[in-house]
Swiss-Prot record:
Complex and partners: Interacts with the phosphatase PP2A-like catalytic subunits PPG1, PPH3 and SIT4. Forms a ternary complex with SIT4-TAP42.
Entry function: PPIases accelerate the folding of proteins. It catalyzes the cis-trans isomerization of proline imidic peptide bonds in oligopeptides. Acts as a regulatory subunit for TAP42-associated PP2A-like phosphatases modulating their activity or substrate specificity, probably by inducing a conformational change in the catalytic subunit, a direct target of the PPIase. Can reactivate inactive phosphatase PP2A-phosphatase methylesterase complexes (PP2Ai) in presence of ATP and Mg(2+) by dissociating the inactive form from the complex.
GO CC entries: chromatin; cytoplasm; nucleus; protein phosphatase type 2A complex
The protein, known as: Serine/threonine-protein phosphatase 2A activator 1
GO terms of molecular function: peptidyl-prolyl cis-trans isomerase activity; protein phosphatase regulator activity; protein tyrosine phosphatase activator activity
GO biological process, one term: mitotic spindle organization
Similarity comment text for this entry: Belongs to the PTPA-type PPIase family.
Amino acid sequence: MSLDRVDWPHATFSTPVKRIFDTQTTLDFQSSLAIHRIKYHLHKYTTLISHCSDPDPHATASSIAMVNGLMGVLDKLAHLIDETPPLPGPRRYGNLACREWHHKLDERLPQWLQEMLPSEYHEVVPELQYYLGNSFGSSTRLDYGTGHELSFMATVAALDMLGMFPHMRGADVFLLFNKYYTIMRRLILTYTLEPAGSHGVWGLDDHFHLVYILGSSQWQLLDAQAPLQPREILDKSLVREYKDTNFYCQGINFINEVKMGPFEEHSPILYDIAVTVPRWSKVCKGLLKMYSVEVLKKFPVVQHFWFGTGFFPWVNIQNGTDLPVFEEKEEESIEQANAGSPGREQTSTRFPTSTSMPPPGVPPSGNNINYLLSHQNQSHRNQTSFSRDRLRR
C-alpha cells in the first residue's frame, strides 16, 4: 500500500463516511492507512517549504497546471464571499449568512471540480468534494478549527496522490496554502466564525496549527541566519514586515489584529515558544509533535475526518484489512439523511456516551505542552516558568 500514490486506475472512490465515534475508534485511526498518508504528506510539504524561505508574495501562478486549477477553484470560493455579504446586526455566535455561503459552495463545488479535473478522473469528485468542502468550517456550528485546516491539507494530498503535482516545489506549497489561509481569515472576519473545539487561552491558536508548522519550517534550514528569530515574533512591526512571505508571521499577525491585551496573556503557548525555544528547527520539531497529540490523536478534532475508499481508506496500514466499523444509531442516520449534503460534516452531537478523552474546551496540561515544545539543554527556570505563570493566572 503506497503512501504517495493511489493505485490508479484500480482504486475505487466513494462518498466519505464517518468512522470515528469514540476513544477506541480514535485509536483505530492511528493504525490506518489514512493517517499514515496524512503524516507522509505533512512531512513532504513541511520539507518542501523549508526550501522556500523567501517566496514571491506577488506570485499568482505555478508551472504545474493542477496547482493553477486548484487556485482557480479557491478564487471562485473567494468570490462567493463577495456574493454573500454578512447579515446586518450583532451576532454572538457567527453570522448566519455563512450558511448561505456554504450552501452555494455545496451546490457549485462538484461542477468546479469536474471542470478542474481531466474527464477520466471525475470518479474521484465525491471524495475530493468532501475534503475541500469541509476545509472552510462548519455550516451548522458556524465555527472553524484545526480539523478543517487538516481537511485542506488532505485535499492537496489527494490531488498529489493522483500524480497531479509533478515536480512540486516549496513555492507551489506556499501558493496553495497562502491562497487558502487568505480566504479562511476573510471568512472568519466576515462571518465572525467561532473557534472549533478551542482550548481557549491554553490552545496554541483559536483556529490554526498547521500554519505555524509550515512557517517555522520555512526558516528552519536558516536557523540562526533566519530574518527573524523566534523571540522576535513578539515585535509587531517585524511580524508585519514578514507576514506576506512567512506563514508563522502570518499567523501571529492575524492574532495581533483580532486580539487585545498583552500577547503573553491571550496567547501564552506561542509566547512560551518565543521566549524559550531559540531555533526555528526546534520550533518546527516541537510543533509537529504537538500536532500529532493535539490534532491527530484528539477525538473532538478527528471525529469529523471521514473516510472514502480511495484517498484515505479506513484500512489497516499493516495488512490492508478493514478496521472495525460501528453502526450509527438510527436517529443519527436519520439526522444525516435530513441534513443535506451527504459527505459533509453536519453536526457536533455525535459524541460517544463515555470517553476518557477531554471534551472541547478542556486545556492540555502544562506539563504536556512543555514536553512537546522542550528543547535540549533548556534551563530548569525555563521549564517551570510557564507552569508558574499558568497557576498565577
